[in-house]
Structure formats: structure tokens, C-alpha cells
């Protein structure tokens, strides 16, 4: 669930980029569509948010104080799903001189206190024959048996459009 980011500013290239080095670099990584651990920062691109990521479909975001970014960290171990949600703010302290791209930033985080999302789960992530606990920001929001339902397969398909991310069970979470 972790990504290695590699950004190179190439003078004189603008958006005319030689993508030939990208494919061999990407090939050295393995896609994990249903990770047991991830850290994801949800933010708008050109004013639009993604509907979801990994196994989470976000319905409402915590935009307290004009905040646009939320960091989600998930760990699954022994049928316990632990999630931490934080509002994230950046303060740029150094910019690249030619294009003004932020190069060094200070980060501050606060626990998210609002929001609503669907957490999708599959049998390769948790054991459906045993109780599952979901803990969000230290608070237990679910403790019980998951009930597989074709409805969750359909809604996860509609959200992610990814055959590797079809989930038979879901937990609705409201902070």
C-alpha cells in the first residue's frame, strides 16, 4: 500500500516528457489492490476529489476550517481494522526558483472529527467466520460478524471500476 514517489523537474521539457524510463521503473513495483496497510492523503485535483481509494469510498469529508486534505492510515491485523483520519495542512517553506513548485513543506495534522465513508472488506483481508472490529481514531465503530451481500459487490464495482477491488462486505462509518 505504500508508493515510492519520484518527481524529476527537467528544464526545457515542460509537459513534453519522455516516458520511456517510466515503464521499467514502474515494473519493479507490485500492485497491491487490497492492502492490509496503507497511508493515503485525500485531496482535490483541479477542484475534484476521487470517490474512493483502496477499499474506502468517501461520502463526506472533514473540511473544518477550510481544510482540503485528509490523511487516512489503515492497518488490519487479527481481524481488527484500525483507521486513523487526520486533517492535514501544509506550509511551504521552500520553492523551486524557476517554476515556484513547493519543494520543502512543514506539515501539521489534527484528528478528523467529521466525515462519512464506507469501508469495504474481503475474505483475504479479514476472516468472515470470526468477529471483526473496526476502530476509527481510537473509537470502536463496529464489532461483529460481516455479512457478505451482492449489493456490496455492486457498489464497490461502481465506485472503483476495478475487478481487483470487488468487495462482498462493508461497514458504514460516520465520525
Model-found features: residue ranges?
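Alpha/beta-hydrolase-fold serine-hydrolase catalytic core, especially in secreted/extracellular enzymes
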Residues: 1-175
Amino acid at each position: 500500500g505504500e508508493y515510492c514517489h519520484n518527481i524529476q523537474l527537467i528544464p526545457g521539457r515542460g509537459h513534453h516528457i519522455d516516458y520511456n524510463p517510466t515503464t521499467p521503473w514502474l515494473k519493479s513495483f507490485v500492485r497491491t489492490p487490497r492492502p492490509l496497510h496503507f497511508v493515503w492523503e485525500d485531496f482535490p485535483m483541479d477542484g475534484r476529489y476521487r470517490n474512493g481509494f483502496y477499499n474506502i469510498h468517501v461520502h463526506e469529508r472533514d473540511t473544518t476550517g477550510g481544510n482540503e486534505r485528509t490523511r487516512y492510515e489503515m492497518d488490519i491485523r487479527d481481524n481488527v481494522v484500525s483507521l486513523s483520519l487526520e486533517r492535514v495542512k501544509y506550509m511551504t517553506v521552500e520553492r523551486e526558483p524557476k517554476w515556484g513548485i513547493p519543494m520543502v513543506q512543514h506539515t501539521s495534522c489534527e484528528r478528523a472529527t467529521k466525515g462519512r465513508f464506507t469501508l469495504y472488506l474481503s475474505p483475504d483481508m479479514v476472516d468472515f467466520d470470526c468477529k471483526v472490529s473496526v476502530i476509527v481514531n481510537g473509537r470502536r465503530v463496529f464489532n461483529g460478524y460481516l455479512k457478505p451481500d451482492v449489493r456490496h459487490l455492486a457498489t464497490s464495482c461502481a465506485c472503483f471500476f476495478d475487478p481487483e477491488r470487488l468487495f462482498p462486505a462493508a461497514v458504514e462509518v460516520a465520525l
